[in-house]
Amino acid sequence: MAESTTPEVVAYPAGDEPLPVLSEVEVRVLGALVEKQLTTPEYYPLTLNALVNACNQTSSRDPIVSYDEATVTRGLDGLRDKKLAYVFAGAESRVVKFGHKFAERFELGRAEVAVLCVLLLRGPQTPGELRSRTGRMHAFESLPDLEQTIAALAAKQPHPLVTRLPRQTGFKEVRVTHLLGGSVSVSSAEPAPEPPPVDRTMQLDQDVAALRQELAELREQFAAFRKQFE
């Protein structure tokens, strides 16, 4: 699917700078840049080849992708248009490298950047998953400590950067998602309806009937087997 590098924006009241809406490729490229800055700063900024590898790595990524250099370059161009990435050409390096302006653009602290980085690279996460998966970037002392960071991002001005999704059926925790891919529609975020309760007695009766049928079939098969030797 072709990716557009034309900046898309969400409409906000006059006077506010629009929140950029990132494509899937831009989300992955930005997440990879942020992650490598926090976890391996000695190799940051990244060359194009290193950035391609960071986008395509199979660990800590959901979904797993296989971008080529042209795709990643388009993502970089889009991020640069949205003032979220830059080209670095140091005096001691002949190779062009790339960095991000994520924290500066949204005035974020390290804890906030770590949370958003995981959401960019892995999609919606529960608070427990976020605390576990941000460990290399920022060590949250407790789950309440993480919850405070999530709350701060959800109340960020002028535009929230994360939101909580309705609890899924069968899950104890709600999930958190970033809003840099656009706002979450209410209809798609509505929780699935609860399944009707199962009558336990009826279920047991059905299980017993199925076992009896299997036993009858086994008896018939054994009887046929015995006749071969009579």
Swiss-Prot record:
Query: HAMAP family per the record?
Result: UPF0502 (MF_01584)
Query: Per its record, how is this protein called by name?
Result: UPF0502 protein Oter_3715
Q: Which SUPFAM superfamilies match?
A: Winged helix' DNA-binding domain
The UniProt entry, under InterPro entries, shows: DUF480 (IPR007432), WH-like_DNA-bd_sf (IPR036388), WH_DNA-bd_sf (IPR036390)
Organism name: Opitutus terrae (strain DSM 11246 / JCM 15787 / PB90-1)
Which PANTHER family does its entry note?
Answer: UPF0502 PROTEIN YCEH
The record's Pfam families line, in alphabetical order, gives: DUF480
Q: Which family does it belong to?
A: Belongs to the UPF0502 family.
